[in-house]
Structures are given as C-alpha cells and as structure tokens.
C-alpha cells in the first residue's frame, strides 16, 4: 500500500520524486521503486527518518517492534502515519517514547486504483496542521474519514474487509449471468460496472441507498422479484453478519 500512496502523491503533484524516500531491506524492491517512481531508496531506516518530516510506517505487524527499536528515538520530531494493521496509537507511543504526533490509518485495497477508503484516528499530540497533512496524503488515493480509534475494528470489518465482500458479490452476479446464458467476459463486465456505477450514484446523489433501490423496483417488475429472492436468502443479514464477524476477529487479533 505504501507504493500506492507514493504513486498517488506523485500523480497528484503533491510532492516531487526527490521528496520521497522509501526503505526496504530487499535491494531488488528498492531498485524497482527507484525505476518506477524515480524516488530516493535505500535500506537504512535511520538515514531516511533523519532526513524526513513525515514518516509512513508500512511494515508487517510482526516487524514493527524491530523497526521502532531502530528508529523510535528519531520519531519525536516528525509526523508519523501508521498503516500497520492492528497497531494502536498507544502501542506505537510505548515502543517509541516521546513520539506524540501519530496518526493511525486504515486504508483498503482500492487505494491501488486511487479509489480507496481510509479511516484516520489522530493521536492527542497531533495539531490541526498534522491532521490536514494526513488527510491530504490519503486523499491522494481515495476518500478519507476521521474516526475515534475505538472504532477502528469496525472500520476493519466494513471498509477494510469490504472489498472482498464486494468481489464475491461481483463474482456471484457474473455467475448468475453466465447461468442465464451470458458469456463469462460480458457477465463480469456487466457485474463490475453495475457495482461501480451504483456506488458512484450513492456517493454523488447523497440519497439513502433504500430510496435509490426503490426507484429501480417497479411494482410487479423484474427488480422487485430479484430483491424478494435476496430477502429470502438473508442477503442483508448475511452482509451485516460478515461485518460483525470481521470486526470481532479484528478485536481478537488486537488483544
């Protein structure tokens, strides 16, 4: 996801290539990043953090303690944006004493096409300028909301895991089309574009999804027949249950 963020920042002309420094222990990945974006690269986290004003922590959760042990003492003068799954503001503060300007972010995979949804939770030490900077960074790859940190598990269950639910829904819609005689490629395009267009209509119209649904469902028509089948299958309850299950699992993993 850090690559997607870098790409979004550069595409949006929010910074220049020489203003980004990516670190990675694997030389081949550094070479690829340099070739792809023209940014500074290296394997020394300390050098990069010493140079930076904003640090994005984008490592696997199990690697975070080692990374913070290496650079924790240098983080007290920078704005820290963490996209490390499950790592709380408190845990980062405890592993990097003196660091207070911390933002916890939960982006999702559509950031790779700059249509992501990111939730931000701000540490107590963040200024209004820090909050504005954090929003700008993640708006480069989609939309942004601010939440209390206690709601991050629910964010994980909804927008974090949500793309997978939607992928499965698109697959099921396409399979339904194929079952009714449509060619596979055509069915997948119809399904994916329908989901994309419906989502855009919700966002841009500002209307409740139920109102938009009712406009499509004519009395005795095809759409209401399909909706009736979804109700019989427990469609809404199943989706709500998926969000609940993923939220609870996120809570378990965070303990």
Place the predicted regions along the sequence by residue:
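Short pre-catalytic strand/loop immediately N-terminal to key active-site residues, enriched for Gly-Thr
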Residues: 103, 152-157, 209-214
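Short acidic-hydrophobic, aromatic-tinged amphipathic segments that line or gate anion-handling sites
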Residues: 40-45, 145-147
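Small-residue helix-packing motif on alpha-helices
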Residues: 20, 30, 48, 183-190, ...
């Amino acid at each position: 996801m850090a690559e997607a963020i870098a790409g979004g920042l550069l595409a949006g002309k929010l910074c220049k290539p020489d203003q980004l420094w990516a670190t990675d222990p694997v030389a081949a990945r550094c070479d690829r990043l340099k070739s792809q974006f023209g940014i500074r690269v290296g394997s020394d986290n300390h050098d990069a953090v010493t140079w930076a004003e904003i640090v994005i922590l984008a490592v696997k959760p199990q690697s975070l303690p080692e990374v913070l042990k290496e650079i924790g003492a240098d983080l007290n003068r920078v704005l820290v944006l963490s996209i490390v799954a499950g790592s709380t503001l408190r845990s980062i503060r405890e592993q990097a004493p003196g660091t207070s300007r911390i933002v916890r972010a939960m982006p999702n995979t559509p950031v790779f096409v700059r249509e992501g949804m990111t939730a931000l939770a701000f540490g107590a030490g963040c200024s209004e300028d820090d909050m504005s900077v954090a929003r700008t960074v993640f708006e480069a790859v989609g939309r942004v909301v601010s939440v209390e940190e206690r709601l991050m598990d629910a964010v994980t269950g909804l927008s974090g895991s949500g793309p997978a639910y939607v992928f499965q829904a698109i697959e099921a819609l396409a399979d339904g089309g194929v079952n009714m005689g449509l060619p596979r490629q055509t069915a997948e395009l119809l399904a994916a574009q329908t989901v994309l267009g419906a989502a855009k209509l919700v966002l841009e119209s500002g209307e409740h999804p139920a109102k938009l649904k009712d406009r499509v469902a004519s009395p005795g028509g095809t759409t209401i027949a399909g909706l009736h089948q979804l109700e019989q299958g427990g469609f809404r309850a199943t989706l709500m249950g998926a969000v609940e299950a993923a939220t609870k699992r996120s809570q378990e993993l965070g303990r």
